[in-house]
Amino acid sequence: MVDIDGSTNTLNLSQRNDGNANSEHYMSLDLDSSQNVITMQQLNDGDKFLFLDVDNNNNTVDINQSGSGSHYLDLHLESGSYAHDVDISQTGTGSHGARINLDGYSTDFDLQQQGSTDQNYSVDMTCGTANGCAVSTTQGN
């Protein structure tokens, strides 16, 4: 599913596997805004699920789910006219899952889940600082 309402969006989406017929990738995207730069990739074997709902403008989002593990991501950004900068990478053979909901002022958010050990992460954040907020999390071996 792809639903883009607005203009000046830059999107670079790709999905591919290494030839395993049993691996699946699924992506869903809903922007409803303008001036977004979004790069999403889901690579290698292993099931990958990704949902994204922006409802905003001036966002930069980079997401890369790779490796042979099953990875799940559900991301929602909503913040009026403020900007977000989000970088997420879930890699490795472990099953990694993340749910992120960012609201309020600009948030520089980084999440790295990696390795063979299963990792899960959930955050529901509203940035109340006009200068912005920053969150950086790394999990795995």
What residue spans do the PLM features occupy?
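Low-complexity repeat regions of mature extracellularly deployed or surface/particle-associated proteins
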Residues: M1-N141
